[in-house]
Amino acid sequence: MVVWLKQPDGSCVPLVDMWKPRIHVGGALDDLLNLQPFIPTCKFINKFEKAGDRERSKVLEIEVENESEAQTLARQIFRRGGYSKYRLYDVDIPSTQMYLYSNDLFPLAFVQAEPVHGRIEWTVKDSREQIDYQLPPLRTVRLQISTMKSHRIQTFEDELNTITIQIRDENIVLDSGTEPDKLMRLVGAFRKIDPDIILTESGDSFIFPYLTRRAQHHGILHEMMLGREEVPLRIYEVQGHSYFSYGKILFKQTAARLLGRLHVDETNGFISSDCGLEGLFEVARTCIIPLQRASRTTIGTSMTSLQLYHAVKAGILIPWNKNEPEEWKNGNELIVADRGGFIYEPQFGLHESVGELDFSSLYPTIMRDMNLSGETVRCPCCPNSTNRVPELGWNICEKWDGIVSRSLDILLRKRLLYKKYKKEASDPPTRLRYDQRQAALKWILVCS
């Protein structure tokens, strides 16, 4: 794992940690013992297999090199068990996130790092709870290009016209020389400026794929290094993917990554385009999700990251390809329980003395205060709980704080404070900063 640290003097240094991700395998003890000889790197440990479990189970822990090996090995184990003997865990969690969870780190945290025998010992001198936290000195540039279009729509075959690098109010325009000259001057400018954050519009879908293709056309792709590591821009064979969300088929471009730098494509991300960099930083810190991932994923993914963190810290395994169905309800229970779609018709006409009630994060607050989570409603350990679901009478756990309620707590508390400080702020920049942060947290709470 390569971790980039931004030092107080503005310089950046890479640290290499020999940490490796781990996957876990559950099943009957005899089946696990039969599997053990085929995987020399495995060992038995005790973990909770489900969030609602009260006793730990004996599972196999297997150290793998990377996410690709984790997926391959998981499929082999699943197939070896006839697709029924073994339960796989912690297979599809991004290794960067698991590294943060395992070391109690979060993006942009103020830390002290000490290399020890190939590993890194971390001392965190920061807290996700902080409101007025200090960010590292980050250099931000905006990258734009224009092409000599031969068609109405830009293509990778169009010749490069100009490259513009915007730093605050200054524009650096690269428009002279041949096309290879412009590309190499861009590489030189990045080395000289050494930006931490590169802002683009359509950087994932066009700018960086275009620059890569033009460099390849001129045989200089191996010199096209825009990141901090000596790695050239990459040509992706598969550009993006489609996915289904809320009744729509959507398309997301493959992220263009510049190793050691953060690339934010404002057309391929929601939080940064709606809440600015301050909102993006707040989500990454609070939800413990890498900045590059937070800038492109949905708000649900950020919320999931926070829940995964609490599960990992509680010793709960994360199932692979989770498909646990909702508990069965009869018709009457469904009518009483599922009221989310009910809309009350208003009375038409002109009304006077009308009042308005506005609840701040109503549903997330109810879920936190009433301890509503998948493993706490109708739990087996508290059948006589005084905390019940109205009308249905279902018991809610009194012994265990649910994963959902734990995750919502920090979001609700911080958003309330940001709204308070926003009202009290006297200068517009401070007020805007608090507003962007609370707005970002509001979006995360929407998907709870």
Which ranges hold each PLM region?
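Conserved acidic
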Residues: V3-L5, V25-A28, R139, H151-S448
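Long, charged/polar, low-complexity intrinsically disordered N-terminal extensions
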Residues: M1-E61
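Long, highly charged low-complexity segments
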Residues: E65, T72-I145, S150
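Charge-rich, low-complexity segments
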Residues: E63-E67, S373
